[in-house]
Amino acid sequence: MKLTFSPASPFARKVRIAAIELGLVDKIEFTPAAVVPGQPNDDYSKITPLKKLPVLILDDGSVILDSYVIVEYLDELAGGGKLIPASGPTRWKVKSDHSLLQGMLDSMLLCRYEKLVRPQGLQWQAWTDYHWSRAWNGMARFEKHPDALSRPFDIAQIGLVCVLGYADFRFADCGWRKAYPKLDAFHEKMLARPSVKVSLPPTA
């Protein structure tokens, strides 16, 4: 299997953490790929029309898109029910938490692209503020309802690690650690896991 990835991508990081936790990392060839916002990225569009990272390319040439779907595939490959509960109320709680985190990451990337790609005179601050509020309020929800922080390690906790790591990486002055001490403690605890530490994004 091959995984297209960038060390800076929180979505690719999610898959990398999962692969390590599931004992499958040695079965995956991690292939660096560059997707530049606002550029055609024609070569990468041959792999996926969405031009998004990551993509898992199976040995038969078929592709699996979306970081969650890739983790779900790897989880099943490892026997199932490891990072995504197989059934019951916990399954739906974990999936719902992950969906929230996925949306938070989407909004954070949109904020990043607004500043990085759009010419300064055309940037829309109200739009950026709206999307940042989605990420910030999502953090507030996990701070207020911290049950997700103490479950056995799952896909939602991986997603939260990636959200907080991306906040440190791209929004270092946002103040999330001071605002959300429970999330700060959770993140520090997670850094003790080799999968989390080895997958940290590069220095911004």
Name each region found by the language model.
Residues 101-188:
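GST-like fold's C-terminal all-alpha helical module
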Residues 1-125:
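GST-like domain detector, emphasizing the conserved glutathione-binding G-site
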Residues 185-199:
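Charged phosphate-binding loop/patch that engages nucleotide di/tri-phosphates or the phosphate backbone
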Residues 59, 161, 202:
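Conserved residues at the C-terminal ends of beta-strands
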